[in-house]
Every structure is written in C-alpha cells, then in structure tokens.
C-alpha cells in the first residue's frame, strides 16, 4: 500500500450512518427529490425561452419524426443514411451538440411535460435530473458525513442562484454536472462494495458507473475531461481496488454512449474521430465574444487578427463574485482542512519511517470531490481555452462545491458543536437553509444575473464606470447582465408589445424568430 493510499484510506463507515434507519430516514432522499422537483417546477414558470433552447427543441422534434418513421416504415427507411442524418442532427458544423439534451428533453416532454406546453414541457427532463441529483447528494453526504451536513449540501446546491436557474432550463451543462455527480457516486459505491461484497454483486456499482459515464459522455465533450481525474484518483487511492470500475469504463461506458448515437453505429471509430476533428479544426466555433471586466475578448474584432484570449483570472474572479459568500467560506474551510490533513498524514508516515499510519476517515472521498470540482476550472484557465458565457463551461465545479461546503460545515460542526448537541447543529443547518432559499427568492427570476456582496450585488456589479475608449461606449459596467434572455418571458413579451411613449426596445431577433417558427409563443 502506498503512502498516498494510506493517507487517503476512507476508514470505517461513518458513525452517522446507522445500520437501522427509521422509516422517515429511509424515505428522506425521496422526500428531498420530490421537494426539489416541486420547487423547480414552480420556479421554471417565470423563465422565458433562452438563447439555445429553440435549437435543442428543434433537434428534439427531428428525433420524434425519426422515431415516427421507424415505427411507420421500418428500420430500412429510418436507418437510410440521409434520413438518419436528418433525424439525428448532431456532431456537425451547424449543430456541434451531442444528443443527450434532446433525449432527456423528449423524455420529459412525453411524460410530465405531457400536461404542460412548450417550451416548459421540454424542460421537465432537466428538472427530473436536477431533482434526482439533489436526492443523491443528500443520500451520499448523509451516509458519509452526517444528516446536518447532507442538508447543508442540498442547501448549497439550490442556494447558488446561477446554478439553480441554469439547471431549470433545457440546457446541456447542468446535465454534464448531474451525470458527473451521479457517476462519481457510483464510482465511490463501487469502491465500498469491493470491500463488503463478493461474487457477482461486486459488479453492480461498476456497471452502474459505466452506464452513467457513457450516458453523460453524450451530453458534451466537457464531460470527458473528468475521466483523467478519475484515473488519477483511482491510482492514488489504490488501483487494485478499482479494476472492476476501470473495466466498465473501458467497455460499458463506450457501448452506452454509442447506443445514444445511431449515426455512428455503422462506423463508431470513424464517427467519433470525425467529431474530434470537427471540434479541433473548426475555424469559427471558438471565436465567441466574451465580455469581461468591461472589455471584449475572444472575438475576431478585426478580420484576420488573432482574437485576444480571456485572462486566466476570469475563472477565480467570476467564481468568487457569483457564488454566495457563505458557500465560499465553507468550501475554503474544507479545502484547507483536507490539505492540512493530507500533509499531517504524510509527515506522520515520514516520522514513522515507513510504518503505516491511519489517515483521516473520508480523505479519499473528499479527494474525489475536490479533484472533480477542480478539473474543469483548471482546464478553462489554460491559455487559449475557450472561456465564453461566464461560469457556464465549468458549471459542474459548482455542483461539487456543494459537497465541499458540506465537508467544511461538518468540520466546523465537529470542532465547535460535536455530536452531543444535535439541537444546535439543526439550528445552524436551518439558518443556512433560510439563507439559501432567501438568496434565490430575492433575485428570482434573475438568478443568472446574480452577483454577491463582494462586488456590491447586481446593482454595483452592473453600474457603468469610466473605462476608456477601447469600445464605442466609454462608460460601461465591469460585469454583464445575463445573456440568456431568460427574463424575456410571456409577461415581458406582452409589455414589449405596448411600449411606453418614447421608449426604445432592444431584443435578440433570432431567438424571437425561432420561437415564432416553432409556435412557442415568446413574441408579442
């Protein structure tokens, strides 16, 4: 056993995970899931059609028509090359997305969305995935830390307005985040079952991990970036304990991903390599203008000139000003505590001249949360990496930040409250719940425009200041208002149809035109 493996040993099961749970404790994850589903179903009604949703809905309708042909005319007609390309409009120059968002949206549309109308009916799939994620987050943290920490994890998850509002939309990045969380959960369960189970039951969680990883891989290429992180974590925490999960990652995951992409069935390797070539050699795709600190980056402002990349510090800066401060504090506490614990374990091993020394229970688990949270922000910070749309591209980091916040809370709870004063623990937990709900309620439905008190909130963050003449307007805000157009809902649309005398109306015509074409009722 290596030094790192000793330091990262998860130790015995948590004392907060009793072998016998009450009925309420058993159904608590389900109650959390249902509560999150109801809350999201209420909140989503206030969000208008956003920039990318018309395209996703159009692609969903193409799939519906393709399945109609499959059942009406049989496989020979549906799998004809031209018809397959029309029905599965993905991984191409005009639509670089992968099909998961449309498949999830379609499932929601034909189940819970059956009782709703577009565009909200297509959002139900994402709402269900969000609710399931909340239930898994609660269950996982409760089993490994404590019930109060589990509640704090869910409060942190729904208490980040940008995360919450983004997850309500028919959008890809929340699916990337949720399936990364679910796959990490299955990965951890696989590690535990390797110690506790024997025979065929040892394969349950590795297979589940492979399925979740494969499905998540068809959300977006950013999902793939967590795979090296899993490999590093597995090597550092004992590779012999993860051979089953590694096997399923190499076999089950590719098959699950391929199942969701019929155009690649006839030539899986060629289809995948062609998609990679498209991503790497697209001359236009990454020249997306970025507004950061009052200036425009990453855009070809003058034809033929090389776009200026977004500075690396956009990631830590935007993260620090778009996350509620109490979550930032708890995350810092957890990262600092985990780092010091790892350092102490290494020093103890060195002092013991190679003798095994027990690490802090949970080191491997917290390391998994930390590496999963760090991988995408670190990639986006690399020179030349696309960094458009604020924090959207590394949204999964904020999901794992909820776990880290729970870990930070648990450290403080054990240090200052302990297990003998549960009432005080629940008072502290309830206070954070109120804070999380209040933060979202006060800014709803403008969650995607949230800025915290470190920059004076939304008002100060978007206050025009003198910035010189690098752009036509010398006075402009340092930070941008939402670019999603989610606030242009039906109510605002009616207001726009009857503007006040002398008022000027500015809107994004493509979104309205596509909405009208699909009968989504977004324009006045």
Which residues does each predicted region cover?
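Short acidic/glycine- and proline-prone juxtamembrane loop motifs at membrane-interface regions
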Residues: 50-51, 162-175
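Membrane-proximal lumenal/periplasmic loop motifs of glycosylation machinery
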Residues: 45-51, 69-103, 123, 291-307, ...
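Transmembrane-lumen/periplasm boundary regions of multi-pass, lipid-linked membrane glycan transferases
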Residues: 56-59, 64-69, 94-97, 215, ...
């Amino acid at each position: 056993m290596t030094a790192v493996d000793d330091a990262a040993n998860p130790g015995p099961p948590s004392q907060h995970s009793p072998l016998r749970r009450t009925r309420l404790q058993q159904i608590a994850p389900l109650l959390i899931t249902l509560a999150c589903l109801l809350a999201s179903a209420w909140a989503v009604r206030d969000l208008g059609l956003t920039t990318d949703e018309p395209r996703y809905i159009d692609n969903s309708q193409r799939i519906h028509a393709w399945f109609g042909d499959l059942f009406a005319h049989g496989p020979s007609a549906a799998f004809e090359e031209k018809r397959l390309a029309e029905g599965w409009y993905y991984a191409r120059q005009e639509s670089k997305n992968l099909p998961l968002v449309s498949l999830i949206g379609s499932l929601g549309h034909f189940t819970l969305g059956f009782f709703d109308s577009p565009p909200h009916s297509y959002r139900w799939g994402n709402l269900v995935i969000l609710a399931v994620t909340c239930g898994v987050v609660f269950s996982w943290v409760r089993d490994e830390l404590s019930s109060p920490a589990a509640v704090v994890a869910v409060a942190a998850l729904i208490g980040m307005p940008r995360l919450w509002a983004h997850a309500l939309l028919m959008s890809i990045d929340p699916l990337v985040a949720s399936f990364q969380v679910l796959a990490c959960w299955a990965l951890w369960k696989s590690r535990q079952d390797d110690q506790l189970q024997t025979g065929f039951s040892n394969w349950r969680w590795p297979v589940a991990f492979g399925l979740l990883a494969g499905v998540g891989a068809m959300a977006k290429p950013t999902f793939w970036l967590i795979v090296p992180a899993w490999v590093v974590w597995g090597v550092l925490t004992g590779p012999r304990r993860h051979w089953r999960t590694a096997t399923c990652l190499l076999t089950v995951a590719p098959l699950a991903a391929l199942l969701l992409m019929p155009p690649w069935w006839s030539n899986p390797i060629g289809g995948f390599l062609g998609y990679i070539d498209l991503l790497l050699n697209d001359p236009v795709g990454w020249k997306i203008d970025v507004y950061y600190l009052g200036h425009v980056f990453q855009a070809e402002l003058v034809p033929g000139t090389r776009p200026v990349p977004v500075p690396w510090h956009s990631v830590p800066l935007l993260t620090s000003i778009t996350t509620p401060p109490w979550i930032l504090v708890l995350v810092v506490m957890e990262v600092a505590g985990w780092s010091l614990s790892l350092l102490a374990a290494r020093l103890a091993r060195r002092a013991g001249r190679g003798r095994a020394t027990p690490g802090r229970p949970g080191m491997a688990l917290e390391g998994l949360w930390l590496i999963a949270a760090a991988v995408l922000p670190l990639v986006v910070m690399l020179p030349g990496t696309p960094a458009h749309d604020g924090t959207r591209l590394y949204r999964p980091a904020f999901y794992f930040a909820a776990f880290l916040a729970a870990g930070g809370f648990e450290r403080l709870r054990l240090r200052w409250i302990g297990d003998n004063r549960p009432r005080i623990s629940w008072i502290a937990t309830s206070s954070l719940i109120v804070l999380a709900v209040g933060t979202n309620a006060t800014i709803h439905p403008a969650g995607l425009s949230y800025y915290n008190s470190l920059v004076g909130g939304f008002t100060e963050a978007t206050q025009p200041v003198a910035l010189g003449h690098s752009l036509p307007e010398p006075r402009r805000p340092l930070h941008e208002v939402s670019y999603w157009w989610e606030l242009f809902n039906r109510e605002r649309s009616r207001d726009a149809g009857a503007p006040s005398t002398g008022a000027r109306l500015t809107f994004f015509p493509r979104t309205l035109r596509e909405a009208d074409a699909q009968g989504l009722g977004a324009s006045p």
